[in-house]
Amino acid sequence: MLRAQRPRLARLRACLSRGLHHKPVMALRREDVNAWERRAPLAPKHIKGITKLGYKVLIQPSNRRAIHDKEYVRAGGILQEDITEACLILGVKRPPEEKLMSKKTYAFFSHTIKAQEANMNLLDEVLKQEIRLIDYEKMVDHRGSRIVAFGQWAGVAGMINILHGMGLRLLALGHHTPFMHLGMAHNYRNSSQAVQAVRDAGYEISLGLMPKSIGPLTFVFTGTGNVSKGAQEVFNELPCEYVEPHELREVSKTGDLRKVYGTVLSRHHHLVRKTDGVYDPVEYEKYPERYTSRFNTDIAPYTTCLINGIYWEQNTPRLLTRQDAQSLLVPVKSSVVPVEGCPELPHKLVAICDISADTGGSIDFMTECTTIERPFCMYDADQQIIHDSVEGSGILMCSIDNLPAQLPIEATEYFGDMLYPYVEEMLLSDASQPLESQNFSPVVRDAVITSNGLLTDKYKYIQKLRESRERIQFLSMSTKKKVLVLGSGYVSGPVLEYLSRDNNIEITLGSDMTNQMQQLSKKYNINPVSLTVGKQEAKLQSLVESQDLVISLLPYVLHPVVAKACIESRVNMVTASYITPAMKELEKSVDDAGITVIGELGLDPGLDHMLAMETIDTAKELGATVESYVSYCGGLPAPEHSDNPLRYKFSWSPVGVLMNIMQPASYLLNGKVVNVTGGVSFLNSVTPMDYFPGLNLEGYPNRDSIKYAEIYGISSAHTLLRGTLRYKGYSKALNGFVKLGLINREAYPALRPEANPLTWKQLLCDLVGISRSSPCEKLKEVVFTKLGGDNTQLEAAEWLGLLGDEQVPQAESIVDAFSKHLVSKLSYGPEEKDMIVMRDSFGIRHPSGHLENKTIDLVVYGDFNGFSAMAKTVGLPTAMAAKMLLDGEIEAKGLMGPFTKEIYGPILERIKAEGIVFNTQSTIKL
């Protein structure tokens, strides 16, 4: 291998016109970009061969290089710092730009052939210095296969690393395994030592010392190149058996625990045409976009460790997407009763070693390479986040991009053996002469990226790629994502603030409240547009059609109007409000339009759903059953600001709050359906709360709770109730207003602008059926009787001035007028704070028969001179869902609530960073 082929040497020596004393000089530069880069392109034995041919070889001193400088000197190299004498300079990785020397021939891995942005400054400097650059990556044979590469050693090191990582991960899951005795590849002096450690681990496996509860371990190798072969060399030292991909399912369940199983995956094993499920290799090469991968369904569910050695090209199917990872991390129910000290794996797929280190490639969620210093991370698919700990939920990931540097001596010798036959002709390169005058072999000539200050013909495409990328970057910077926010009420502030953190989002705010829009425009970079939804449909439609997303913060009755405009323009939409029957009627139209409309993203509904689904899904994963679910939530004034007859204040329009008590409600209690009629009788359903006793709370059922048995997937629950929390006394006061007819949404002509103004005394006289001219005492007496002799309710009416001469606001209905009046009397002052109180209670029956009583509490206070608690807890989850849609994190289409992990998982995780933190407690009854 060290002797160059005689015909090639004869040809090269014939080209050497200079005398022996003018022979070219070669230099081995030291690696100085990465602390772990201890390799060299040639080993001492190669230097010895070159010096025997009469060439001078300079060795730049390096204490980092794994092979000692003395070894190179013994081989005939000359140790010196100054390498300007050399015409050929060899390295492994790129040199710093400031150390490049003009009109020299350099050979190294430049990582420029795809116009990689990180190395374009290097390429510019190479061109400026008129350097002839030979890139090892492009030294290929007539079939296009690489001749010079470290691939095999990347596979060897990667496999050793992931076995070590699996030992750590399995220990975190409660299992000691023989893999715990393996270290990282660089901890071994050479691969022989590492292999011996693997053999020792394999011996323990063959003795049956693997934990039974984790089942047989399966390893899947993608690709058939040097990377995969190197990884398999290490794997073969274990007691292993190779099976076909279609056999994985069976061996993953019933395989022998005294061995591990492997399969080598080729394209035909998982790629199929979308139309008929057939694989045609010729067609795939031409039209990869016609194909999809079945890896996620046919192979990944039965894989313990994936060793990926393939690169991803645009338009080709990925091996695994983010959504695939979510489904793969769902635990499979076991028929075996779990033992506390011997748990089963939470999911089959434990680890991925992505030796390709291709970020955003065939493994979609591998977005950043790990390093030798920090080799592992965990991808939590539910939360769609990456964290460094080997504990917690997720898949262990290892994606080091310089793996061969962990076994530097053997990697150097291996690489040098392949490079050595071409070194002498590279030595004859004169960078000052035209490339055409050089007598290079095709292998070397076709690897020359630059020469004489220009890109060579074969690589002129790099400049076009750069220009194309720069255009795309410019367009992406100039083409912002457009969001239309409808409504400028209390909730809009947190929504606008959260979205404004991303400079790539352009926000338009549509509202008919000019003053509020102006105030918000001063705080946030938004485009204010005057718009009255419901009366300006054409203007709404023209606004919507230019957007990427619409957020409706309007009253719920207007959401269908907005949704229709979104359907027409095929624009996604989110809202915090309930998915009403009117919205539900649009479900088919939403599906036909292929858009996403997400509702119930606020607090209640919203965060209550998300917490419920997270708890319920977790219980199901454990094989448990949810027997009861009770959730109460309320927006309240802070206790120090609750001194009024309602014990309540309004942070937005009171209409919805008032009308809520007029609605019927139904819930399930101990297996029986309880129906509550709205209006006067709702007071009978009010219950005092025994938690947070210092707050003196009461609660009442909210609308139809029973339907959530199906939505939440807990049809077996005997108790299911969703309710509203208030301070004690609120319900009684509101009940009085119902008796007086003040909570009535029917049209009331006497309150319209064209009618004569009315005082509250006059309106109340009309409502109780006496003359408007009746004296105050008479009205008070009749009202007292109407209220059933309840002094508390009478005092509430008097406190609000309903028996006085204050003018009634103009409105379409009595409840609208009453709402405006309440806003004037019971709005929050500039220094007053609100609070949110929510409690979710679950009864969870575990497979052991134990009953777990679990509570989740949320208490949030408004900020002094900042956002209210209600605005934060409604606006932030809505804004987060909107951002997730814009960023492509939510791919599902249709009308939906936040009932899937894809939606609730990231929101519940991210909202913690905003200071909204939940407190969870559990007690177990034996």
Swiss-Prot record:
Gene Ontology terms, MF aspect: saccharopine dehydrogenase (NAD+, L-glutamate-forming) activity; saccharopine dehydrogenase (NADP+, L-lysine-forming) activity
Domain of life: Eukaryota
Pfam families xref list: AlaDh_PNT_N (PF05222), Sacchrp_dh_C (PF16653), Sacchrp_dh_NADP (PF03435)
Induction: Induced by starvation.
Residues annotated to bind NAD(+): 488, 512, 516, 554, 576-577, 603-605
Sequence positions bearing N6-succinyllysine: 93, 138, 274, 286, 333, 458, 523, 535, 584, 732, 761
Gene3D superfamilies reported for this sequence: Dihydrodipicolinate Reductase, domain 2, Domain 3, Saccharopine reductase, NAD(P)-binding Rossmann-like Domain
UniProt catalytic activity: L-saccharopine + NADP(+) + H2O = L-lysine + 2-oxoglutarate + NADPH + H(+); L-saccharopine + NAD(+) + H2O = (S)-2-amino-6-oxohexanoate + L-glutamate + NADH + H(+)
Region (Saccharopine dehydrogenase): 477-926
Gene Ontology terms describing biological process: generation of precursor metabolites and energy; L-lysine catabolic process; L-lysine catabolic process to acetyl-CoA via saccharopine
UniProt cross-references to SMART domains, sorted A to Z: AlaDh_PNT_C, AlaDh_PNT_N
Keyword Translocase tagged: no
Function of the protein: Bifunctional enzyme that catalyzes the first two steps in lysine degradation.
Record remark: domains: The N-terminal and the C-terminal domains contain respectively the lysine ketoglutarate reductase and saccharopine dehydrogenase activity.
Official protein name in the record: Alpha-aminoadipic semialdehyde synthase, mitochondrial
Provenance organism: Mus musculus
Encoding gene, per UniProt annotation: Aass
